[in-house]
């Protein structure tokens, strides 16, 4: 059986996390040549490349499996040995989460874990349709995702759904939708997306108004909180989590432009198996809080 040296695995992990050999060498306090040599040793052991030498480098499928193994072993080892504060500081917990969860329910869910556990949280923000891929690549040990099916050697639980409403300010509605939201009026109404892969707004318009992708003018803004601000100041209409704008809707500073047309996104919690005690606490906290604030029907 091929048993990797965890020192070489840590070099592979550093190259991926630091997005290059030079910064990985600085992180590990060794030379860049030593980093390359350790990865070469690992590749020789497994008889195949473990890195794709792009900019930034990315792991091959075998590299992803090895990184997942490393992260799982690190969690289990630290807890089994009781090293709450190792020489590298508190344990690093890397999770992939979507921006809307981060802006609404996720941090309150993690509050008891952060209060009781000495750890460093590394939240990697990604669209919920792509967070699972970060888990597959071994970049994180847990992910909030749209995908209901677990990856091999992983566990999954349903968290609940975020309901999205098509919102804008009253002034925006009066300007762009004086006669209500129609197919023709939507063509002139500025929208906003998180990035060029964010298709929620387009999917909503296509499903309910038969507008093809790319039909409406759309800003790109990488911030869930900025979506709300843009809507409040009358700049755009956009899909917003009901959980995020309940107060604004009650006050009337935002309005639901299409009552009854709800875009529901069910969220799932993925993580490696077996779970460490820390990950079990994270799982319990997310599921418990999700039951309180996310839609369960």
From Swiss-Prot:
DNA-binding region ranges: 21-40
Family of the protein in this entry: Belongs to the LysR transcriptional regulatory family.
All copies of domain HTH lysR-type, residue ranges: 4-60
InterPro entries associated with the record: ArgP (IPR017685), ArgP_gammaproteobact (IPR023490), LTTR (IPR050176), LysR_subst-bd (IPR005119), Tscrpt_reg_HTH_LysR (IPR000847), WH-like_DNA-bd_sf (IPR036388), WH_DNA-bd_sf (IPR036390)
Organism: Edwardsiella ictaluri (strain 93-146)
CDD domains named among the record's database cross-references: PBP2_IciA_ArgP (cd08428)
Identification of the protein by name: HTH-type transcriptional regulator ArgP
Recorded GO MF terms: DNA binding; DNA-binding transcription factor activity
UniProt superkingdom: Bacteria
Protein keywords: DNA-binding, Transcription, Transcription regulation
Organism ancestry: Bacteria, Pseudomonadati, Pseudomonadota, Gammaproteobacteria, Enterobacterales
Pfam families, alphabetized: HTH_1, LysR_substrate
Name of the gene encoding the protein in the UniProt record: argP
Function: Controls the transcription of genes involved in arginine and lysine metabolism.
NCBIfam families hit by this protein: argP, PRK03635.1, PRK13348.1
């Amino acid at each position: 059986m091929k048993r990797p040296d965890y020192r070489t695995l840590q070099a592979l992990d550093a190259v991926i996390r630091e997005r290059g050999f030079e910064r990985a060498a600085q992180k590990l306090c060794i030379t860049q040549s030593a980093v390359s040599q350790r990865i070469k040793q690992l590749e020789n052991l497994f008889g195949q490349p473990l890195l794709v030498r792009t900019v930034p480098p990315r792991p091959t499928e075998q590299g992803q499996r090895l990184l997942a193994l490393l992260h799982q072993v690190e969690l289990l080892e630290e807890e089994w040995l009781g090293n709450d504060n190792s020489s590298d500081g508190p344990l690093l917990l890397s999770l992939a989460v979507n921006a809307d969860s981060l802006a609404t329910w996720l941090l309150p869910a993690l509050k008891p874990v952060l209060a009781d556990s000495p750890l460093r949280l590394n939240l990697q923000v990604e669209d919920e349709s792509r967070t699972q891929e970060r888990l597959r690549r071994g970049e994180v040990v847990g992910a909030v995702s749209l995908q209901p099916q677990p990856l091999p050697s992983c566990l999954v639980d349903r968290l609940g759904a975020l309901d999205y409403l098509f919102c804008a300010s009253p002034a925006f509605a009066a300007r762009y939708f004086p006669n209500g939201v129609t197919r023709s009026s939507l063509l002139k109404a500025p929208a906003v997306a998180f990035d060029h892969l964010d298709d929620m707004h387009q999917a909503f318009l296509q499903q309910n108004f038969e507008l093809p992708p790319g039909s409406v003018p759309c800003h790109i803004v990488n911030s869930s909180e900025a979506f709300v601000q843009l809507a409040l100041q009358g700049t755009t209409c956009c899909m917003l989590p009901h959980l995020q704008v309940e107060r604004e809707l009650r006050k009337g500073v935002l309005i639901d432009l299409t009552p009854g047309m709800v875009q529901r996104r069910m969220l799932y919690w993925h993580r490696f198996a077996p779970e460490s005690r820390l990950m079990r606490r994270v799982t319990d906290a997310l599921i418990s809080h999700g039951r309180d604030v996310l839609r369960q029907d």
